[in-house]
């Protein structure tokens, strides 16, 4: 069984993405790892090279800044990395620059790839998600945030990244997947308040038709945490590769203030109760077809 990892990244230093931690968290499972490196204004290239692994292959790309519809440029860059994977790879393990896998899940993930290799009805493996929010000490649960997504796919070029690279499709249909008992830890919203404000501003250029607003970046250090429907204390351990970042944290999160400012409607509160009692997320968007779990 041959496994290829792949990701895309641009301006990782400027945007404080833990891309080195992301790559190294799954590198031991991979025989090769493709990094689609977009033209950057910082030291991202050296950051990747400093991982110093013969498994890593960098392909240099230029982001199409005319693609401003719903983050579609992220899917285009993902597809560039996927296309560069060696044709003899069986599985392709995708990870984004703000995601990590805890080392405790690696044996299970490897076994799932081995056990499902011969089952052609399984086109991908579906992971559970934990979204850390504002701090490494808290994670967020919300109906507006995806709780599962495909991160391992067959190395079949009929597959392509979908929408803003959240998931994948086989041509135009949903991929048939097995849900596995492993989590992706998503750290994209773990930043000091000013960093979160800047992230929202920078992301706008890839989701809004007109790109960046004409106004300068917001001067405020206050971030609106109102979309955190429920913040829960994280009582487990983080991936070992993340520990250095966690030790360097220099801000405090006022969870009590966030609780007071929550903007959870009565309808969402009711639907959350239904999910808590039954496990059923009413109206959940599913960019996949679960055929095995």
Q: How does the language model describe each region?
A:
Residues 3-6, 10-11, 16-21, 36-94:
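Active-site-proximal specificity loops/subdomain of glycosyltransferases
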Residues 71-79, 100-293:
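Catalytic-site signature of metal-activated, phosphate-bearing donor transferases
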Residues 2-7, 26, 32-35, 184:
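Hydrophobic targeting segments
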